[in-house]
Design a protein with these regions (language model features):
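A short, well-structured beta->alpha microelement
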Residues: 20-30, 323-347
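Short, acidic/polar
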Residues: 16-35, 99-113, 183-194, 222, ...
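Active-site groove signature of glycoside hydrolases
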Residues: 34-49, 90-146
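Short, well-ordered secondary-structure micro-motifs within conserved domains or adaptor modules
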Residues: 340-358, 378
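Active-site-adjacent "subsite" loops/lids of carbohydrate-active enzymes
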Residues: 5-27, 55-116, 129-132, 158-159
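A conserved amphipathic helix/loop scaffold
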Residues: 355-589
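Surface-exposed amphipathic alpha-helices with a cationic face
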Residues: 1-4, 33, 57-71, 157-172, ...
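Hydrophobic targeting/anchoring helices
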Residues: 44, 83, 118, 123-124, ...
């Protein structure tokens, strides 16, 4: 391995494998080993066409000369195999798994690949959206969700894993999950069950340009989705996968790499060989990987506010990422973090529930037990609205109700330093929230929003048993979180803090926390970005912050040791400046 903490890998698509010459391959390899330093490739055997065996063997031979490890890969897309396939309206040429010729083709692909490699990965087109007559007939009375979840498990067992292991009993098969987690169940992706039958998994961390692509993904997903899938298959999440497409500037591409690395992956996958060989966007990668590798050697395990996202769930899409973008360290998990009296005090005692959490039919009872035992649960407004309708027993925990009206706010009332006092701040433009009401003094408001003489709470809490239940009202358009005034964001961060560290400042800065008293800051290089001054609050008495080095050469204009401004109220406060496109990591010295 070129790096101590991760392998750098790339992917070679079948069409390119078929046309590349040995001379071109060696020229590309020289470029990549100079600028990126590749440890491993996944060599694709099928994507609309089979890669020829002689070409595969040539690529493997050349990679051996460069000391590059080679595994296989397949992408489950295929052209029409006969005239009848023209009736099937297939997105991206994905397979119809009710069609026997296509089923036979996939089985053939699996067997072919297993005969060439001891490991292969399935790219994230392993889904179905086909609604042809054959699919309608086989679905019967089931919903498309039910049908596709069952169908893709059957396809995995009977057409991929079974045939491959029959050819090569030692084969290891990896399934890559896409970056559209909220839609998995509607297309057949089934991580809750697929994790049990595949040897390992992989994570799509492509976020590209968040505002100019059809998915509109917050950059933080490149970190948070890695962490979510680590909870899905602990120790078996093989890595994060991103690409240079729809990246209008260097930083847009590089930030995908940074955030993937901050999540501590085993592998960092840069899709794909022909897209990065000779691409100027790839030229800084090796330089930055050296820096990241040195930093990662000092970091413990990532930690943050656990966010419960059950399997096959949808709702509040990517709210955990929007919150991560405003500086709250997030730790999405697939199982509810229940605890008892003997559980250690820490992040496990705080959990965020979103509308996706409502997929769990036992969620309110789990929530009640969690809070009563001393936990602090935060729920989004979308969770609260859905729970009031679906699980009215939620009223046991709070007086909050939903009016079915909208709160338009440009004035905010935030806590002042002195108890019982308030500060007032205006936003640059109105922000809309769902209007939730509460009964004064039964539920206590931390922060209000509104206009003129009408305000309602957007952050309030109840006490229940030994715990605390907070309702966090998020904007109707989640990206409007970025537009909230700094004092509003600071109040949110303080209430949601699960790591003992919170930021006082504006948006566009993410905080990454680890379980060994280390943390990092990253200021996004997005439109309109600029250096930001902020304050950092750390629980307890802290002597100093020591910068974690990213090279053997000290950074001339960055202090290596930061002394506190002051200590007050059980916290130590530091001041600092963050620069767009630069990451800064520190060790807390007590």
């Amino acid at each position: 391995m070129f790096y101590k903490n991760f392998k750098t890998v790339t992917y070679c698509v079948a069409a390119w494998v078929n046309r590349v010459t040995e001379e071109e391959l060696r020229k590309d390899a020289d470029f990549l080993q100079k600028y990126v330093k590749i440890d491993k490739i996944y060599l694709e055997t099928y994507r609309d066409e089979f890669a020829k065996r002689e070409q595969i063997e040539m690529v493997k031979r050349v990679m051996k000369d460069y000391g590059i490890e080679v595994s296989g890969g397949i992408t489950t897309v295929t052209p029409d195999l006969n005239e009848s396939d023209k009736k099937r309206q297939r997105l991206f040429n994905t397979f119809c798994y009710c069609n026997e010729p296509m089923r036979s083709r996939l089985k053939e692909v699996s067997e072919y690949t297993a005969g060439l490699f001891d490991e292969f990965i399935i790219d994230d087109f392993f889904f179905t959206q086909c609604m042809c007559e054959d699919c309608i007939r086989e679905k019967g009375d089931r919903s498309w969700k039910e049908f596709r979840l069952a169908k893709m498990m059957e396809v995995s067992r009977d057409l991929v894993i079974g045939p491959a292991k029959k050819v090569n009993p030692n084969i290891k098969i990896i399934i890559k999950f896409p970056n559209w987690r909220e839609s998995f169940q509607e297309t057949g992706y089934n991580p809750g069950q697929e994790r049990e039958i595949y040897d390992s998994i992989y994570t799509g961390t492509e976020t590209r340009h968040g505002a100019q692509t059809d998915q509109h993904l917050p950059r933080y997903l490149s970190y948070s989705l890695m962490r979510y899938f680590e909870s899905v298959a602990p120790g078996r999440n093989g890595g994060g996968w991103f690409d240079p497409f729809d990246c209008d500037r260097f930083d847009t591409y590089l930030e995908q790499a940074y955030l993937t690395a901050f999540a501590k992956p085993k592998e960092i996958m840069m899709f794909c060989w022909p897209a990065i060989a000779g691409n100027k966007r790839a030229t800084p990668l090796g330089f930055m990987y050296d820096k990241l590798d040195m930093i990662l050697s000092h970091l413990g395990q990532p930690c943050g506010l656990k966010t419960y996202i059950p399997f096959n769930s949808q709702g509040d899409d990517h709210i955990e990422d929007f919150i991560g973008m405003i500086g709250v360290p997030m730790e999405p998990v697939c199982e509810f973090p229940e605890f008892g009296e003997n559980t250690e005090i820490g992040a496990s005692r705080k959990v965020l529930l979103t509308a996706a959490s409502l997929e769990d039919s036992q969620i309110v009872e789990k929530l009640r037990r969690f809070v009563e035992a001393g936990g602090h649960a935060i729920v989004t407004s979308a969770f609260m609205i859905g729970a009031l309708e679906k699980y009215p027993e939620i009223k046991e925990l709070t007086s909050v109700s939903y009016t079915k009206r909208t709160l338009t706010a440009d004035e905010f009332q935030t806590p002042a330093e002195l108890p019982q006092f308030k500060n007032y701040v205006k936003s640059n433009a109105p922000v809309e929230f769902p209007l939730l009401e509460h009964r004064n003094n039964a539920t206590w408001s931390i922060m209000n929003a509104g206009h003129g003489e009408y305000h309602e709470s957007i952050l309030c809490y109840d006490t229940y048993g030994r715990g605390r239940f907070t309702v966090f009202c998020t904007p109707q358009m989640p990206s409007k979180l970025y537009d909230l005034p700094a004092p509003v964001l600071t109040t949110i961060r303080r209430e949601l803090d699960a790591s003992g560290i919170w930021l006082d400042g504006g948006s566009g800065v993410s905080l990454f926390t680890y379980d060994n008293k280390t943390f990092g800051l990253y200021c996004y290089a997005w439109d309109g970005c600029k250096p930001q001054d902020l304050q950092l609050h750390i629980k307890g008495s802290v002597k100093e912050l020591v910068r974690i080095p990213d090279s053997d050469r000290p950074q001339m204009f960055k202090p290596q040791v930061i002394k506190p401004l002051y200590e007050k109220g059980g916290e130590t406060v530091f001041s600092g400046r963050v620069i767009p496109g630069e990451f800064d990591f520190f060790e807390i010295k007590e």
